[in-house]
Amino acid sequence: MDKSKRSFLKSKRSVRRRLPPIQSGDLIDYRNMSLISRFISEQGKILSRRVNRLTLKQQRLITVAIKQARILSLLPFLNNEKQFERTESTARTTGLRTRNK
């Protein structure tokens, strides 16, 4: 190939496959808190399949396990560890009008 055609070819990058998040020996159970907590967001929401990189069956089992743990009070429904600071709302104060009588 001459030099002009060579610049258009894409370089082949090696594709690194990530390890599956659930190994074959892992037990998907509502009591396995170390496993379940990996699939919950900071806000306490169940992460999607695309984010987790799980199969459909694994995602269903994780979802059921998380819901069982929530019902049995092993997991909170909402994660309230973050204390949200309430700041003054500037939109409300600037939008007020005074009525002239």
UniProtKB/Swiss-Prot annotation:
GO terms for molecular function: small ribosomal subunit rRNA binding; structural constituent of ribosome. GO terms for biological process: translation. Keywords: Chloroplast, Plastid, Ribonucleoprotein, Ribosomal protein, RNA-binding, rRNA-binding. It is found in: Plastid, Chloroplast. GO terms for cellular component: chloroplast; mitochondrial small ribosomal subunit. Transmembrane segments: none annotated. InterPro entries: Ribosomal_bS18, Ribosomal_bS18_CS, Ribosomal_bS18_sf. Its main location: plastid. Part of the 30S ribosomal subunit. NCBIfam families: S18. PANTHER family: 30S RIBOSOMAL PROTEIN S18, SMALL RIBOSOMAL SUBUNIT PROTEIN BS18M. Belongs to the bacterial ribosomal protein bS18 family. This is Small ribosomal subunit protein bS18c. The gene is rps18.
